[in-house]
Design a protein with these regions (language model features):
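Active-site nucleotide-donor binding segment shared across nucleotidyl transfer reactions
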Residues: 47
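Short beta-strand->loop micro-motif that forms the acidic, two-metal-ion catalytic signature
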Residues: 50-58
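Short Pro-Cys-Gly-centered "Cys-loop" motif that presents a nucleophilic cysteine in a tight turn
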Residues: 1-44, 59-285
């Protein structure tokens, strides 16, 4: 039986899936290729540096197969790009059935709000590695070059695959297949019915509600690098110091609590950044 499903990968703690722009572009293209092999419809998605989210329509088995294939492609790319041996091995990919209209609206907003919740100072519509810009946009058509009109060599250089693609697949100037080619934006517009309702959902802070329902409230949502970019301001505001090395042991203990609360950082992640023993951090948080 077909239905709506939320796919979410557990955040990597020691590495990133997408480290640079080229990785994100490849990750977006992987979505476009993966969806061709399964009987699923993509309503929305968001790629973060260390995890990903999708809301799909299909059977549970097809949605699961799609998510596992996408995870496999991510792992292959990580290994080829940096020699990462572990890649995505052991990374849990959750699949949750969306059982009502309210939950569907909330989980779509949750997926598209991910960058904002992670402290990235962009409206969801302007985050380039998600489908947020596709909805209620007045029918603006994205333009690009047709993949099927390219030479075979150029096409393979972009896709890293020889899989046949529809004539509707267009590529932008950075070699990325336009999300409008493979995301069913009209289905999402039918869910929300009006742009004001969609905007209100994106404006609400719904992370706790959705994560409790998903059972992933303890999931790491930020990488070490993302935390470190904000940690300096936190230390200056709370302790009037410039770096962790200037903090006393008592202040480092308090910093553990602040990192847990502000960044939802895990025990091992806090220990790495503060250079405290994981057992000490566990007792504190």
């Amino acid at each position: 039986m077909k239905g709506y499903y939320h796919i979410s990968s557990h955040g990597l703690e020691k590495n990133d899936i997408f480290k640079k722009k080229e990785d994100f572009v490849a990750g977006m293209n992987d979505i476009a290729i993966c969806v061709l092999g399964f009987d699923v419809i993509i309503l929305c998605f968001c790629l973060m540096s260390n995890h990903f989210h999708f809301v799909l329509y299909g059977t549970m088995s097809e949605c699961r197969r799609f998510s596992e294939e996408y995870k496999r492609r991510c792992a292959m790319r990580m290994k080829l790009a940096g020699g990462e041996v572990q890649g995505m091995r052991g990374v849990e990919v959750k699949i949750a059935f969306v059982d009502c209209q309210e939950y569907l609206e909330n989980v779509i907003a949750y997926v598209l709000r991910n960058p904002l919740a992670a402290g990235i100072l962009l409206l969801p519509y302007h985050y380039p590695w998600s489908s947020a810009a596709l909805y209620f946009n007045g029918g603006i058509q994205q333009t690009g070059e047709s993949l099927n009109e390219m030479s075979e060599r150029k096409r393979f250089r972009i896709l890293k695959s020889r899989v046949p693609v529809p004539d509707s697949y267009l590529v932008d100037g950075q070699g990325m297949i336009l999300p409008s080619c493979y995301v069913d934006s009209k289905a999402v517009e039918q869910v929300f019915r009006h742009p004001s309702r969609f905007m209100m959902s994106l404006a609400r802070k719904i992370e706790n509600d959705v994560e409790i329902q998903l059972g992933v409230a303890e999931q790491v949502s930020m990488t070490d690098q993302e935390i470190l970019t904000q940690l300096g301001d936190l230390i200056r505001n709370e302790f009037q110091k410039e770096s962790i090395s200037e903090l006393s042991m008592e202040q480092r203990i308090r910093l553990c609590l602040l990192m847990k609360r502000n960044f939802r950082a895990g025990i091992k992640q806090i220990a790495r950044i503060t250079r405290l023993d994981p057992e000490t951090v566990a007792k504190v948080v």
